[in-house]
Amino acid sequence: MAKERFDRSKPHVNIGTIGHIDHGKTTLTAAICTVLSKAGTSEAKKYDEIDAAPEEKARGITINTAHVEYATQNRHYAHVDCPGHADYVKNMITGAAQMDGGILVVSATDGPMPQTREHILLARQVGVPKMVVFLNKCDVADDPEMQELVEMEVRDLLKSYGFDGDNTPVIRGSALGALNGEPAWEEKIHELMKAVDEYIPTPDREVDKPFLLPIEDTMTITGRGTVVTGRVERGQLKVGEEVEIVGITDTRKVVVTGIEMFRKELDAAMAGDNAGILLRGVDRKDVQRGQVLAKPGSITPHKKFRAEIYALKKDEGGRHTAFLNGYRPQFYFRTTDVTGSIQLKEGTEMVMPGDNTEIIVELISSIACEKGSKFSIREGGRTVGAGTVVEVLE
């Protein structure tokens, strides 16, 4: 089995195919798996296996996504492909499948289309750092001048959304040709993966980022002090280090006097651990669910921010009606709901269920957040939308 050969010592990168409907995203995903399977670093996948994407839930929203994995000489990749446009929007905004980079698929027969633009904008908003372009269907649109024009158009489009359009690699190929085993087109898949290897940066591992733990619960241990519990979101923490309690009340620094996991004492807690953190000189009433413990200076509390949001459709459990300027739902960050008001961008009268749009949010109390923080929008405990912080304002 090809599966045995995955080498976990290679750097891991999360990637995804984006682009307009029917431009060949899923065919390309299948082609990458199939071509790399011949080199023994992937399992061959048929189009239908990828297209029948299973449902998953993220932040209370159902999304269809297909996950495949493959490796090149240099890296291990987890690749996400979504069957429908709405799934892409939801996926990017909820961060259900984190993307460290994207493969933008554009058909050479059509050029950039409305969803091409929308996906580029979303990628920009949610912080996808770089993309590689695959100009697909070059076996059909085989006029080099036409391909040249489409390539220029894509580069200009990338530039208009703040990507480096001049230096973005553009590979001209045919996903279907490669899937059918035509050597010239298979070579283009190798060329694409080489560009992805070289152009898309390796992300920092979660463990190497500044420490952050969202507080889920607090308790007092007689004679020892206050313990907060939660799952470490990123970074690592050692006994004796200082952390800040951020959000809701004024930020304060405290010293960690103990770390426990499954009733065992530890020297350190790392990303992914569910841990209890013992804090020196803190009263239980001074800490609460919804705050975070963080490396001092790494994250600050904010009340006002710009965000990109998706409003759930009625059949997804969302609202039945549009919401207007001044709408006041709850914003669920990590472990808690905070009420806030929504200001729509100029020229937007209302937000209909199923829309995605940019808004400004003002919360009633400050919460630890930064560019890229994810949240749900809730109304009486049910999720009616999801969002990503694009920029903190105050």
Swiss-Prot record:
Residue span of region G2: 60-64
Enzyme class: hydrolase
Keywords: Cytoplasm, Elongation factor, GTP-binding, Hydrolase, Magnesium, Metal-binding, Nucleotide-binding, Protein biosynthesis
Occurrences of domain tr-type G (ranges): 10-204
Keyword Ubl conjugation: no
Region (G4): 136-139
Protein localization: Cytoplasm
Domain of life: Bacteria
Chain intervals for the UniProt region annotation (G5): 174-176
EC assignment: 3.6.5.3
Region of interest: G1: 19-26
A GO term, aspect molecular function: GTPase activity
GO cellular component labels: cytosol
Residues noted as binding Mg(2+) in the record, renumbered to the chain: T26
Major site of localization recorded for this protein: cytoplasm
Ranges where the record places region G3: 81-84
Catalytic activity from the UniProt record: GTP + H2O = GDP + phosphate + H(+)
Binding sites annotated in the UniProt record for GTP: 19-26, 81-85, 136-139
InterPro entries in alphabetical order: EF-Tu_GTP-bd, EF-Tu_GTPase, EFTu-like_2, EFTU_2, G_TR_CS, P-loop_NTPase, Small_GTP-bd, T_Tr_GTP-bd_dom
Self-association and partners: Monomer.
Similarity section: Belongs to the TRAFAC class translation factor GTPase superfamily. Classic translation factor GTPase family. EF-Tu/EF-1A subfamily.
Matching PANTHER family: ELONGATION FACTOR TU, MITOCHONDRIAL, ELONGATION FACTOR TU-RELATED
Role played: GTP hydrolase that promotes the GTP-dependent binding of aminoacyl-tRNA to the A-site of ribosomes during protein biosynthesis.
Protein name: Elongation factor Tu
Biological classification of the source: Bacteria, Bacillati, Mycoplasmatota, Mycoplasmoidales, Mycoplasmoidaceae
